[in-house]
């Protein structure tokens, strides 16, 4: 299993961007090009199913498991308040044996299936967000926020609310920034500060399949055959979407 590490002790915007590039480079197939663009495309499913992301702070490491063929979250690993490594996983996404290979630090006895599912709505419900529209948008994004949310699960007794908030922020700061340069640029522009998320961030996040499909099936030389509206105005040039990574949809058309 490949590991990619983000050091959260005084990181720079450049280090963060190179971390995001490593995620893209690990999952992309360099030979795949969709819609006459140079946007990275995830490769077809392979034997290596998972990618391990390590967040390092001065107090220790918390790790995230992502599926390489779509960057969906499958599990996370953290020490509890007695310094025992515990792996928590979404049972529909990964088996116990696969989890052992991904996070060998946690014994089978210390693996626990999460009581909720891996979709944003289910995680948001468990995050108990009370303000605004009660979605992940209300939490904001940014490196400082990633660090504080990680520390809430690092060497602590498990608190579901803190765990769910960590997952919401960690997923966006890894998988979503890899998919969308628009979100990555917000993180680097505000680096390392926490910033308010906007509707466009959420629109991008819920439109990855839709955008990938449009580029794959209805773009030529980087131009769509018609205007597309993904929830933030009409787009004709693919480059205006600032995509970082496309979903695997088969051989180019």
Swiss-Prot record:
One of its GO terms (molecular function) is rRNA N-glycosylase activity. Keywords: Hydrolase, Plant defense, Protein synthesis inhibitor, Toxin. One of its GO terms (biological process) is negative regulation of translation. PROSITE patterns: SHIGA_RICIN. The active site is at residue 176. The keyword Hydrolase applies. It holds the Pfam family RIP. Its EC number is 3.2.2.22. It catalyses: Endohydrolysis of the N-glycosidic bond at one specific adenosine on the 28S rRNA. It is an enzyme of class 3 (hydrolase). InterPro entries: Ribosome-inact_prot_sf, Ribosome_inactivat_1/2, Ribosome_inactivat_prot, Ribosome_inactivat_prot_CS, Ribosome_inactivat_prot_sub1, Ribosome_inactivat_prot_sub2. Ribosome-inactivating protein of type 1, inhibits protein synthesis in animal cells. PANTHER family: PTHR33453, RIBOSOME-INACTIVATING PROTEIN (PTHR33453:SF34). Belongs to the ribosome-inactivating protein family. Type 1 RIP subfamily. This is Ribosome-inactivating protein saporin-5. It comes from Saponaria officinalis.
